[in-house]
Design a protein with these regions (language model features):
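Pre-Walker A segment
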Residues: 1-3
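Conserved P-loop NTPase motor cores
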Residues: 5-28, 33-38, 51-55, 201-322, ...
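Walker A/P-loop NTP-binding active-site region of P-loop NTPases
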Residues: 27-87
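Beta-sheet entry/capping signal
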Residues: 45-49, 70-74, 187-188, 237-239, ...
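A generic structural motif
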Residues: 52, 72-81, 272-274, 319-329
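P-loop NTPase motor domains
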Residues: 62-66, 84-263, 267-270, 324-339
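Metal-dependent catalytic core segments for phosphate chemistry
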Residues: 76, 198, 298
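P-loop NTPase motor core of the ASCE superfamily
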Residues: 95-136, 283-370
Length: 370
């Protein structure tokens, strides 16, 4: 398989979209297949950035010594040394991009809409002032709001500051004095954030807890940071791999970001791999039309089966199609290639190292019979 081929205008292809979707419930082989394709792409010269919210790839340097020198694992914990590392003003290279992301994150956390004529202009003005200052950080936005002094500005400052009480939130807020930033110089870069609390799949945005809001906000920051990665050397094929993508595809800012990543990827020889549970997560028409390769693993839910078949452009009411998806074995998936062909594909580990290195099952205690 050549994941970079779609953009080359190959005769007979029905898509030039580089991005891919990996769909399926837990335990069907979705993560294994995704990891294997990324690994081989890197082995053959691609560069990759994996957003790993469940921190399942921390073992890769140990388990894959042949490429260990080209693996960069960034593990962001709530330790003091990581303070502010995910602040938009720290993580983004261009001040304008940092400003845009700061607005997105602060409106996401506070629920202030751009259509709110009372609160939004005050927040926008404070962010712009910080962007034009020498000292930039989200804590500086709080300071700027307090300087303005109006009851509304102070209320917004109090609201934002209430999020900083969580140790976990220290990653998002800097005082403008942070100098170090995340480096993506290696061929295979993995960003992990410890203690993320992702909302359950069916949880609506209005029901998010504070920890869930902060967790999704951090994923949005990291995924936006991926834009900088995409805009590197156009001659090198790149992959941005978004594990648990459903967690931010379910919020407006996340959907906008996903479309932005895919569009930038098309122009910059980069693929975005969405690893998610349901086809409905990628139902947005503009996003769906920019996904070339599709992989669907076993599902037993008839509603989900029909949505997946529809996503593949197949008849969702055809019982043969439904049965095929329902009866897939572990490691098997329904795949659609760049020529529009659909068929069942089996992913074989070939080497035991892959089976062990990509294993996401929790370890069992010694002596426990299986």
């Amino acid at each position: 398989m050549q994941p970079a081929l779609a953009s080359q205008g190959v005769k007979g292809s029905v898509t030039n979209a580089l991005s891919a979707a990996f769909l399926g419930s837990l335990g069907g082989g979705k993560s294994f297949a995704n990891n294997l394709l990324v690994y081989y792409a890197v082995l053959y010269g691609a560069r990759a950035l994996i957003v790993d919210p469940k921190a399942e790839r921390g073992n890769w340097k140990r388990d894959f010594p042949e490429i260990a020198d080209e693996i960069n694992i960034v593990n962001l914990t709530s330790d003091e040394r990581n303070r502010g590392m995910l602040d938009p003003y720290v993580i983004m290279r261009r001040p304008k991009d940092a400003e845009s992301l700061a607005i997105d994150i602060l409106t996401f956390l506070t629920g202030i809409s751009s259509r709110d004529g009372n609160h939004f202009p005050i927040l926008r003005r404070a962010v712009r002032t910080v962007t034009n200052s020498k000292r930039r950080g989200l804590f500086c936005v709080i300071e700027e709001l307090r300087k303005e002094g109006s009851p509304l500005a102070v209320s917004i400052a109090d609201h934002i500051e209430s999020f900083t009480d969580y140790d976990f939130a220290h990653l998002l807020f800097s005082d403008g004095n942070i100098k170090k930033s995340i480096s993506l110089e290696k061929q295979l870069n993995i960003i992990q954030v410890a203690d993320l609390v992702l909302p359950d799949k069916g949880t609506s945005f209005e029901e998010f807890t504070t920890m869930e809001l902060l967790s999704v906000a951090m994923l949005i920051v990291i995924s936006t940071f991926a834009l900088d990665f995409i805009h590197t050397d156009r001659s090198v094929f790149k992959i941005v791999d978004l594990d648990e993508a459903w967690s931010f595809l379910n919020v407006a800012q996340g959907k906008t970001l996903a479309n932005k990543l895919v569009r930038a990827g098309r122009a910059m020889n980069a693929a975005v791999y969405f690893v998610t549970q349901n086809a409905a997560d990628l139902a947005d028409e503009s996003l769906k039309n920019n996904i070339g390769l599709k992989f669907a693993f076993r599902s037993t839910d008839i509603v989900e089966i029909k949505k997946t078949l529809e996503f593949f452009g197949l008849d969702p009411e055809d019982e043969g199609n439904q049965k095929r998806l329902r009866n897939l074995e572990n490691g098997q998936c329904l795949m659609q290639d760049l020529y529009g062909h659909v068929g069942v594909v089996q992913f074989h580990p070939v080497f035991a190292d892959f089976l062990h290195g990509f294993d996401t099952k929790p370890p069992m205690k010694a002596g426990v019979a299986v």
